[in-house]
């Protein structure tokens, strides 16, 4: 592909942190903390993950991908950063998780190879790091089987999300390294819904992901002002 739908600076951020991906006290602590919540949410809405072929787009070091494999899914994790993928492969080997594979490939390229081959496609905490989110949504639609499930998560774009996701998370609480997020790449739910419809997916549910920094507790609620997750289905034959 002559022009990849990637931001090299975004990839470099996570490449530099790759060795810490499975350290639950590192910059990736928030991903470890939210993972049980998002895993159960995906598992329930997909009608169970066991025995299904699952693709995790923008998998990084494999926190979600490996947890889905542990639920019995046959998982492929893809990412454009080689260092996080190497970490994911090593961790799966150390934990003897055999039903998982990792590849460095753009999702648009994989869509040309494996159209309609996946029961479930996940793309979590990744949409706000690419130049063209709509292209990602379309590729995910291509990859999932008719009747299959596609899940996304991202961050809303408004003053509240800037305050919470950037000022609060990166500068005040220091949950994330400074510069992790670019406010202008955040995606409003209306924009997300537009891309979903244009791709030929049916929006089933949109829910907010919330965090209390005092109790360090995460929960789901209807408010989608900051972080939110989306469940879609590919209808038709």
UniProtKB/Swiss-Prot annotation:
CDD domains: AdoMet_MTases
Statement: the UniProt record of this protein carries the keyword S-adenosyl-L-methionine: yes
EC number assigned by the record: 2.1.1.222, 2.1.1.64
Transferase among keywords: yes
Pathway info: Cofactor biosynthesis; ubiquinone biosynthesis
A Pfam family matched in the record: Methyltransf_23
GO MF: 2-polyprenyl-6-hydroxyphenol methylase activity; 3-demethylubiquinol 3-O-methyltransferase activity; polyprenyldihydroxybenzoate methyltransferase activity
Keywords: Methyltransferase, S-adenosyl-L-methionine, Transferase, Ubiquinone biosynthesis
Coiled-coil parts of chain: none
Binding site for S-adenosyl-L-methionine: 38, 58, 79, 124
Catalysed conversion reaction: a 3-demethylubiquinol + S-adenosyl-L-methionine = a ubiquinol + S-adenosyl-L-homocysteine + H(+); a 3-(all-trans-polyprenyl)benzene-1,2-diol + S-adenosyl-L-methionine = a 2-methoxy-6-(all-trans-polyprenyl)phenol + S-adenosyl-L-homocysteine + H(+)
Gene Ontology biological process terms from the UniProt entry: methylation
Protein family according to the UniProt entry: Belongs to the methyltransferase superfamily. UbiG/COQ3 family.
Classification via PANTHER family: METHYLTRANSFERASE, UBIQUINONE BIOSYNTHESIS O-METHYLTRANSFERASE, MITOCHONDRIAL
NCBIfam families hit by this protein: UbiG
Function per UniProt: O-methyltransferase that catalyzes the 2 O-methylation steps in the ubiquinone biosynthetic pathway.
Protein name: Ubiquinone biosynthesis O-methyltransferase
Name of the gene: ubiG
């Amino acid at each position: 592909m002559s022009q990849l739908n990637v931001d090299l600076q975004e990839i470099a951020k996570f490449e530099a942190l790759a060795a810490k991906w499975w350290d639950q006290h590192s910059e990736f602590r928030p991903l470890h903390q939210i993972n049980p919540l998002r895993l159960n949410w995906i598992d329930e809405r997909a009608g169970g993950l066991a025995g299904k072929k699952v693709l995790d787009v923008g998998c990084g070091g494999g926190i979600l991908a490996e947890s889905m494999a542990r639920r019995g899914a046959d998982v492929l994790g893809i990412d454009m950063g080689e260092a996080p993928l190497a970490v994911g492969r090593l961790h799966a080997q150390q934990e003897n998780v055999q039903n998982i594979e990792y590849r460095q490939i753009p999702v648009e390229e994989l869509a040309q190879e494996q159209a309609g081959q996946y029961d479930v496609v996940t793309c979590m905490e990744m949409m706000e790091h690419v130049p063209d989110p709509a292209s990602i949504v379309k590729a995910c639609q291509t990859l999932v089987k008719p009747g299959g499930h596609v899940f996304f998560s991202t961050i809303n774009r408004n003053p509240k999300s800037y305050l919470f996701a950037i000022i609060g998370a990166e500068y005040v609480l220091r949950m994330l390294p400074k510069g992790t997020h670019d406010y202008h790449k955040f995606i409003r739910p209306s924009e997300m819904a537009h891309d979903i419809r244009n791709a030929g997916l049916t929006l089933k549910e949109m829910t907010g992901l919330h965090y209390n920094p005092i109790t360090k507790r995460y929960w789901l609620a209807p408010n989608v002002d900051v972080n939110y997750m989306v469940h879609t289905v590919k209808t038709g034959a």
